[in-house]
Amino acid sequence: MLPMFKRIALLVVAGAALSGVPGDAQAGGYYRQYYTSWSYYSTTRYYYRTYYYYPTTVSTTYSYHYCIYYPSQPRYVYYYNPVSQQYWGRFEFGEDGKPKGYSLLAEKDRKEKLADIPESAFPKPAAMPAIPGTNDNEKMEAPPADLPPKDLPKG
């Protein structure tokens, strides 16, 4: 009886481990880039998700940036580079929740604090930029349209 229990426990653990891996990766696929689900950061009262990517096709370790959503600015998802510690652009959604495009900040306009970036520094939304550090000009995937609620969690 114990060996059967151990086999069931092993299957449950393996299933739980695989459930955290994206679908194609479960089948031995390759993900050049992907976004995690949203998390809430109560100290600064914003939501964030991580954008993981391989800078090159031969990279073996993911790099990442943060996507930050402020409920007070519900149309935008801001991209933050944790290495340079700067906001470098934002993705805009329309009032209807449909994607409008990406605004890539000029190098001179990238700042550590969003409050230090004037609204006028953001260009009109356009196509997604290349994956950061890429040598093949592969474009970033747009963020999923599953924006967090506009109302902050209680507590």
Can you name each region flagged by the protein language model?
Residues M1-G28, A121-G155:
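Classical secretory targeting signals
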Residues G29-P118:
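Low-complexity segments
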